[in-house]
């Protein structure tokens, strides 16, 4: 810190600041990729609870979530946190039966897809979808906005320190001009 006793606020960013930044700059945010919220479950095909699991993954009330969590050890994969937005490319890379060629077959909202192979049954359901060109939700941009605010503060801090150094040098006549 500079020797003048000023406190410097750089890293603490409040939710209000992030929301304000988002609202002020909302016209600058445009998705360049599709985002989705989804549920995914991969379960051995011989699981005795398969009918309940199918029903629960589709509706997913709190009780259903508790039931699925209690069976978690039986699943090869479980992703039921459908309140988080994911980039379509990340979903495609993490779910083996979805690829660039067939992705449009699996992107209808609230439709349960059941994909079977020799060992497993895969359940996949898109709960929400935002196509590229739309404005992304704040929750998706939150960390990026926070980082932007911190970086802007750092730039302002450096500029202010440089000004203070220059002003101090001018006041005390302790400077040299280089040509």
Place the predicted regions along the sequence by residue.
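Peptidyl-prolyl cis-trans isomerase
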Residues: 1-179
């Amino acid at each position: 810190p500079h020797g003048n006793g000023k406190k410097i606020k750089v890293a603490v960013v409040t939710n209000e600041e992030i929301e304000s930044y988002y609202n002020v700059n909302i016209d600058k945010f445009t998705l360049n990729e599709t985002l989705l919220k989804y549920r995914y479950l991969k379960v051995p095909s011989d699981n005795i609870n398969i009918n309940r699991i199918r029903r629960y993954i589709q509706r997913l009330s709190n009780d259903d979530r508790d039931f699925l969590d209690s069976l978690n050890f039986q699943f090869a994969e479980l992703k039921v946190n459908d309140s988080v937005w994911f980039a379509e490319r990340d979903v495609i890379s993490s779910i083996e039966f979805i690829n660039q060629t067939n992705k449009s077959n699996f992107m209808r909202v609230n439709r349960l897809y059941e994909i079977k192979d020799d060992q497993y049954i895969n359940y996949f359901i898109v709960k929400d979808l935002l196509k590229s060109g739309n404005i992304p939700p704040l929750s998706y941009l939150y960390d990026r906005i926070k980082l932007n605010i911190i970086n802007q503060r750092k730039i302002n801090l450096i500029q202010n320190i440089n000004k203070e150094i220059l002003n101090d040098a001018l006041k005390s006549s302790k400077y040299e001009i280089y040509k």
